[in-house]
Amino acid sequence: MLLLKAKRSFEGYVLISPEGNGIEGIAFVPATNGAAAGSFYLVNQSDELGGPDPSIVFEVEINHAASGPEARIVRYFSVGVTDLSGIHYDASSGRLLIISDSNEALLVVSLTGDVLESYPLPGKKQEGITIDGNGSLYIAQDAKEALLKLIQK
């Protein structure tokens, strides 16, 4: 097992507070230019849109240096809602699917951070999101119904 550590700040701005809620979701996006393996997109669960420890999405690249691999934050963006709790990369559309627990919303977001679509979600306490091989969307919940199947393409 390899443990990668990333700094909690980017260009002097604190993105992840040690006392905060922390990272809730991670998705891998393969590189299209062949220069790197790809990037990880992570969501930080927070009740704040600004200030230290904001509710944001950030992109992390892995640098395979001679001294060992290092995780490096390369950029971040806000999607305008708090309490981000899950993220999935939809390779068929090239978009990120992001859920917000307290807002009970599904956001469709470009890799540059533009919110393209927003949908209300049924249920409560959505925590995880994925798409199966048939294009059906599943959301895990910390509620009575543990798994929701929402959309079939």
PLM regions: where:
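Sequence/structural signature of beta-propeller domains
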Residues: 1-153
